[in-house]
């Protein structure tokens, strides 16, 4: 195998496939990058950790077709360190040489025969959209994905199509995020799939510079195709909880507040709130205000008064301040808060109604 390629092109390709490489595996082959130089001027890079598989195709000056498996992390570090010029790669059965200007590296290689086959997914359903739309929606729901691996279903993002409407949902059982995407799904049968949250975030980031992304669904796999990249992920098995029954259909108290001012006040007051100390919100209709306060025993307390449009009466309620900030970070200039009572979940959304809704459980105060 022998080919020449621009450093920038190779570095970008390696950065794309690195996410599919196993960082801690008892199988050395999974820590490598399969490099396949094809006749016709194409070089294909592949990685897999057996849960996800990534393939990236790039143009190159292929002198001799062939395959090899290079040590992924070391190969990446070498390419990053080389000057911005053409890189030559030549591989035999036992070693490979990487050359650029006056610099030369020799690396041990693994047998490409031992590298797992790339999964060819026959998708039953395919949906196409702009990567920017997907990235925006994934970014809004990602913060509510659970990190508790013992509850695998909550570590994923629910991707659902219902009556032609596309929606992403996530929850860690303390808060719930729902994002509707303005994507036409007419002709697509209703379905749902749970995609690992970290994988979904990786795809949204990797596809950001592409014009289009297609998402295909098979029995137990999802395939994302964007530009010259194919990303295959497993689905998370299991039944996602019925989140709709958690969404209130009415509220007692409605509030409108300027998002930036609210966030700033929460951050200031939270300096006196420990991790498990609730942030106290007191909404007063007559004063059209909210008092944000917190107190920690043997430390002290803080409070801040803000203007707020309050309808429906007064209410005092406590929330985890970090969960509040996570929700507010996805909202527009003005936030709408809907409350049913001091011990019932609250709803936050943008006054602009951008299709995003954030439900948060209160903390007893």
What residues fall within each predicted segment?
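Structural preference for solvent-exposed beta-strand-turn elements
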Residues: 1-365
């Amino acid at each position: 195998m022998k080919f020449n390629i621009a450093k920038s092109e190779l570095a970008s390709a390696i950065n794309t496939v690195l996410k599919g490489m196993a960082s801690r595996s008892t199988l050395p082959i999974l820590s490598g990058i399969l490099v396949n130089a094809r006749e016709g001027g194409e070089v294909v890079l592949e990685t897999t950790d057996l849960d996800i598989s990534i393939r990236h195709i790039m143009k190159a000056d292929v002198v001799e077709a062939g395959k090899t498996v290079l040590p992924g992390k070391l190969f990446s570090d070498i390419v990053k360190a080389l000057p911005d010029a053409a890189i030559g790669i030549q591989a035999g059965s036992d070693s490979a040489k990487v050359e650029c200007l006056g610099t030369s590296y020799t690396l041990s290689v693994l047998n490409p025969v031992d590298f797992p086959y790339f999964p060819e997914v026959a998708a039953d359903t395919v949906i196409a959209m702009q990567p920017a739309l997907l990235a925006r929606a994934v970014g809004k729901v990602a913060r509510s994905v659970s990190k508790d691996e013992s509850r695998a279903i909550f570590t994923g993002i629910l991707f659902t199509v219902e009556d032609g409407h596309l929606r992403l949902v996530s929850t860690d059982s303390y808060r719930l995020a729902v994002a509707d995407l303005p994507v036409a799904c007419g002709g697509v049968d209703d379905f749902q799939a749970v995609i690992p949250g970290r994988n979904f975030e990786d795809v949204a980031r990797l596809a950001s510079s592409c014009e289009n992304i297609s998402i295909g669904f098979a029995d137990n796999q999802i395939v994302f195709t964007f530009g010259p990249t194919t990303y295959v992920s497993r689905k998370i098995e299991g039944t996602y909880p019925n989140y709709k029954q958690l969404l209130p259909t009415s509220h007692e108290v409605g509030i409108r507040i300027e998002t930036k001012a609210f966030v700033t006040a929460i951050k200031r007051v939270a300096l006196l709130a420990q991790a498990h100390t609730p942030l106290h919100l007191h909404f007063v209709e007559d004063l059209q205000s909210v008092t944000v306060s917190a107190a920690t025993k043997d430390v002290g307390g803080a409070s801040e008064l803000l203007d707020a449009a309050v309808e429906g009466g007064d209410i005092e309620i406590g929330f985890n301040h970090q969960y509040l900030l996570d929700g507010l970070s996805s909202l527009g200039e003005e936030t709408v808060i809907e409350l049913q009572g001091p011990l019932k979940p609250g709803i936050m959304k943008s006054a602009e109604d951008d299709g995003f809704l954030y439900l948060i459980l209160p903390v007893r105060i």
